[in-house]
Amino acid sequence: MNNTLMQAKEQFAQHELAGSLQTVNLVISNDQANGEAYLLRARIHYKMQQWGEAMNDYGSVLEIDPANQEAKSGIEMAKNILGYFAPDMFNP
């Protein structure tokens, strides 16, 4: 595993969300096919309640690994949250 990604995971585990986000962005900028990095960034966005960004990153994970269950669940949970907060968005 990439040392920078390990650092981002450690920051995330210590609830340093902004630092973890910045670090994982470096990983993704150097390796856009790193599904593990997108998954971590999705988790960070989810914890920061940035639902759209989380869904985008979960979608990127699914492009790389279509069978990833965490990404599928994450998208559904974010959709449910958005549906609760903004029902007009899905039911015009």
What is each of the regions a protein language model found here?
Residues 1-2, 35-36, 69-70:
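Helix-start (N-cap) detector for alpha-helical repeat units in TPR-like alpha-solenoids
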Residues 26-27, 60-61:
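Canonical positions in the second alpha-helix
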